[in-house]
Amino acid sequence: GTAKLEKGSAAPKVVVTLNKGGERVLNAKNVMLAVGARARALPQIGLEADGDKIWAYRDALAPKKLPKTFVVIGSGAIGIEFASFYRALGAEVTVVEAIDRIMPVEDEEVSKTAQKGFEKRGIKFKTGAKVTKVTKTANGVSVAIEVGGKAETLEAEVCISAVGITANTDGIGLEALGVELDRGHIKTDSHCQTNVKGLYA
């Protein structure tokens, strides 16, 4: 079934809507949330994984086919790992990154050195690039980007979305309880307790 939090007497109660119909209410002194995460989607530009032409990280881990060309959007750990992996398998790979260097959380010197190494292996990079539209085509995907004010279009069989991870916190009742979130992630103290008594994450 699916679960939702509601206000309880001591701690929030968990209301489970059963697959076969009906509900089950669980009361406890403490409730631990372990909701997991999923790949972030950007539907406003057409970047939503479908497992076919637009892949999230899970699709890229267990592909149904081995495409010859890829556009990877995002050059953090996930994007770079898949770009490197599929290039090693012989695919042509272009990585698109919004800021002016790859691997943005790494030291700038590390980013520059890594990019040179990846380029020697044949990976292409478009840095400082804004993705404006991802469109599915008969042969794959078309990725429209802007680099330095100039529009470009990249074509590939598959686009890998590596634009981040988001917590599975939608629709589980956090807002109604007043649970504090930070960009969708549950805020906790040093004991993993949220701002709601008896609710941990």
Q: Residues of each region from the PLM?
A:
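A conserved short coil-to-beta-strand element within the FAD-binding core of flavoproteins
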Residues: 1-13, 40, 127-140
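Glycine/serine-rich phosphate-binding loop and adjoining beta1-alpha1 elements at the start
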Residues: 6-13, 17-53
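Core beta-strand elements of the Rossmann-like FAD/NAD(P) dinucleotide-binding domain
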Residues: 20-30, 149-158, 195
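Short glycine-/small-residue-rich Rossmann-like dinucleotide-binding loops
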Residues: 36-37, 147, 160, 164-165
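Glycine/Thr-rich phosphate-binding loops of Rossmann-like dinucleotide-binding domains
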Residues: 41-43, 80-81, 86, 168-171
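FAD-site-proximal beta/loop scaffold in flavoenzymes
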Residues: 48-66, 153-201
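Rossmann-like dinucleotide-binding cores of NAD(P)H-dependent redox enzymes
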Residues: 61-62, 67-71, 77-150
